[in-house]
Amino acid sequence: MELNSTEKHVETITTHETHVLSNTKSVDELYQGRVSSTTSGSEENIATLEENDNKKLTFTTKREWFEFSLLIVGIVLAMFMMSLNSTVVAPAMSIIATELNALESQTWIATAYLVALNSFQPLSGRFSDIFGRKSVFIFGIVLFFAGSLINALSTNIDMLIAGRTIQGFGGGGVMSMTFIIVTDIAPVHLLPRFQSMLAVVYGLASVVGPLLGGAFVDHATWHWDFWLNVILAAIAFIIMVFYLKEPKEKTQTSFMSKIKRVDWLGTLFSTSFIVCLLLALNWGSPYGWGSAHSIGPFVAAGVSLIALIYIEGWVAHDPLLPARVLLNPPVTIVYGYMMCLGLTFIGTLYFGPVYYQSVFGADSTQSGLRLIPFMVCLIGGSVGGGFLIRKFPSIKYYIMIGAASNLLGYGLFYTVSETSSWGQQAGYLSFCGLAFGLSQQNSILTVQAIVEHRDMAIATSCINFFMMLASSIGIAIYQTLYQIFLKQEFAKLPLEILAGAQSYGALSNFLFIRKMPLELQRPVITAYSDAIHKVFILPIAAAALGFILTLFFRNVRYGVKPDEKRDEELSLDEKNVTL
């Protein structure tokens, strides 16, 4: 297998490797940047990002500025709708499942989307290298639009799950392509700010999602959770069709030659591995971990993984997942950290509303509002990091601060009980939001500085893939632990309280707790609180592991030129020789 070279390299981004705007100057006329990665044999390996201060993003006409601005708006809309869709149904899942008479299939409303999203996300980076950024991006938006429309018109759970699956395939392409295209079109010296913008939009939509979802459920209908994405997808599609174009060499390549470049076996087995793994995790709880529903997919996932490793390492000429990327230790560590971040992030977004509704009696809108401190600090961390990075260029330390904040936030949130004040909860969630804001875009910058430019698209898409994969696995694990701990807590209740709660349906649906007599509510609320309390041990463990991983991050320094670094090292060596 080919591993990442340890020699220093400098790769220039040219107009043949970037996208151009319709009716505007080519990208290399708008800016010229260079990304460098160096690895030394010293104890602390330093990777650097070199910025070109002589070239800036300039426009000769107002039309050029307007078209570039529209392109950015389209990218932001695409990211917003994709992220919004991941969480907008979180506070409404119980209500949707109740209305569709499908409480036993409730988790599939989220899982179907995440399984499909993770299946296509690792493919999108390589496909964009073959078929072009625009083709993959537009394809993703069209699928997302179709899935959203099906969901908005759903009258039964099967129709809804089918729509969520189609949405997921589209979302997998959209999410990765936003970061990849921004890297293509943004000047290097502005890249941290552009990626911070995407991280802000992702985090903002993730937190606004539960708020909007709750408001639609409380004051309109849950169908608007999906009609909103139909509208956003249509607008994003129109903008991208007119203002994002491929380089000429991409459009002149025949379709059949592109088809021949696809690693079809790698695509088949990577998709099979992800789908089977997530199915096994989601079927374990309802059918039993020893049942054929669980063991069968686990075995299939294992076989698919072995086949995938063999094909990518020894068979594929143009592998879907190059070993030089996945087996590059500094890159692997970043991916591991993003999995830890995804595992904690999804716990907040999905089980935060459950906690607020079951224990504190909040409605769907209120449970979304309680996530605002998380959102505010996420935005602050992302924007602040993007602006500070040029003055304090050691990216590793931003991520370390974020990881420490994540561990502190979840450690404190674990102490929340039925009597905790809203101020305490808001303060604890603020640390968690800051963690995500400081981590996501800086992790992307780290990986992009380490890998070769030809692997930039696949390396970037894998960052989002591993984060979302962990989120998908996390939902299944959280739900399983939640059900196990809830049964344990219910078993502790006196028989008369248990029977009363059962008669009101409060044991299977926390929305019915407040319909019971007051003397029955308190013990049942305590049972829900204790169960969720135990579930939140998992994000604490993930946050702790994530912090440990950041200690081994390569120190990527933004804006430090390789020549300056070498001169500094040579000067130190000369002093040592003199001594």
Located regions from the model:
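Transmembrane core module of solute transporters
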Residues: 70-95, 101-113, 265, 292-296, ...
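Hydrophobic transmembrane-helix bundles of small-molecule transporters
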Residues: 220-336
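Interfacial helix-cap and linker-helix signal at transmembrane-aqueous boundaries
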Residues: 96-97, 127-128, 160, 212-220, ...
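Cytosolic juxtamembrane N-terminal segment immediately preceding the first transmembrane helix
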Residues: 2-84, 98
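Helix-loop junctions at membrane interfaces in 12-TM secondary transporters
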Residues: 68, 153-164, 221, 415-429, ...
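Residue-level signature of mid-helix packing/kink "hotspots" within the transmembrane helices
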Residues: 87, 114-122, 172, 206-207, ...
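Helix-loop-helix hairpins in multi-pass membrane proteins, especially solute transporters
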Residues: 121-265
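Hydrophobic transmembrane architecture of multi-pass small-molecule transporters
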Residues: 53-54, 235, 444-445, 463-554, ...
